[in-house]
A protein has these predicted regions:
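Hydrophobic membrane-insertion alpha-helices, especially the h-region
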Residues: 8-23
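Aromatic-capped interface at the extracytoplasmic side
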Residues: 20-35
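Bilobed "Venus flytrap"/periplasmic-binding protein-like clamshell domains
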Residues: 32-60, 109-175
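Acidic, polar ligand-binding/catalytic clefts
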Residues: 70-121, 126, 186-191
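A structural signal for short loop-to-beta-strand junctions that line the ligand-binding cleft
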Residues: 98-106, 134, 232-240
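Pocket-lining segment of extracytoplasmic ligand-binding domains
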Residues: 158-244, 255
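Short amphipathic alpha-helical coupling segments at ligand-binding clamshell hinges
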Residues: 256-266
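Conserved small/polar residues in nucleotide/adenosyl-binding loops
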Residues: 269-271
């Protein structure tokens, strides 16, 4: 999108938001002034999105309380137990509550499989991870849930892999205490960005990415072109085949309709 069009679109959304905010004050019954949202780790993309929404809702006189968690699976559990009003949930996360309502698909989150370059083994299939020191995410995280799903498809036991969260995985991989780390999130997430730019760390390209989509439709094959991260340093040096899932904003079904409309509008601004 070119800059003039982007500016026009942003200004248009701003005008709509102002008009909506004025009308919002007169809705009967009145929308709530306090709302809770389960996000994720405080260094992750879900929490960053929550912080942005928190500031925008505060401008409308609504207090959004953010609940940091291990990630998507824990978020779903909190939502199912009606302990929060809203949650950010990774596509494919199993939910059991019939009283949940998907509000919006926000953006794609790639599964990044990082490997130390010094590991001489060429990894293009998950079965080639056998015998390596691998982190697949902390229990309760979307990374862990997705990794378990993929490992099960390959008839691999995930009990032998390490349950480290994203920050722990990043630090351990950089320190040489891990060979491979699974991480789900956006490229601008601090930990993921650090690994994408780190010397001695490379991305695994999954040659069978399209086949996973046939097994589970919520998995989307993604192509990361050579140089997409950094053209000057040619990161990555070649095209990488990845898998991605959709980040979704989900609510309990009793959330006020006017609040839903406001959340959808703000989501357009912050994604």
């Amino acid at each position: 999108m070119n800059k003039p069009l982007l500016t026009t679109t942003t200004f248009g959304l701003f005008l709509v938001l102002v008009a909506f905010a004025l009308a919002y004050q007169f809705v009967k019954p009145a929308p709530p002034k306090q709302v809770t949202m389960a996000t994720g780790g405080e260094s992750g993309g879900y929490h960053a999105f929550g912080v942005a929404m928190q500031a925008s809702l505060a401008d409308q006189g609504i207090e959004l309380t953010l609940i940091p968690t291990q990630g998507s699976v824990e978020n779903a559990a909190l939502l199912e137990g009606a302990e929060v009003d809203l949650a950010l949930i990774q596509g494919g996360t199993h939910t059991q509550g019939e009283h949940l309502r998907g509000l919006a698909s926000l953006y794609f989150e790639p599964l990044w499989i990082f490997k130390r370059v010094e590991v001489s083994r060429n990894v293009t299939r998950l079965r080639e991870l056998k015998g390596l020191r691998v982190s697949i995410g902390a229990p309760g995280s979307g990374t862990r849930a997705l990794a378990e799903e993929l490992l099960t498809l390959n008839d691999l036991s995930f009990d032998v892999f390490l349950p480290l969260n994203t920050k722990e995985s990043t630090q351990a991989l950089l320190a040489g205490e891990l060979d491979v780390a699974f991480v789900v999130g956006g490229a601008t997430s601090p930990d993921i960005s650090e690994l994408l730019h780190a010397d001695g760390i490379e991305l695994v390209s999954l040659e069978r990415a399209p086949a996973y989509h046939l097994q589970h439709r919520y998995l989307s094959p993604l192509l990361l072109p050579a140089g997409a991260i950094d053209l000057a340093t040619e990161r990555p040096a070649e095209d990488k085949a990845l898998l991605g899932v959709t980040a979704m904003l989900v609510a309990t079904d009793d959330v006020h309709p006017a609040l839903v409309d406001l959340l959808l509008l703000l989501s357009l601004i912050h994604i």
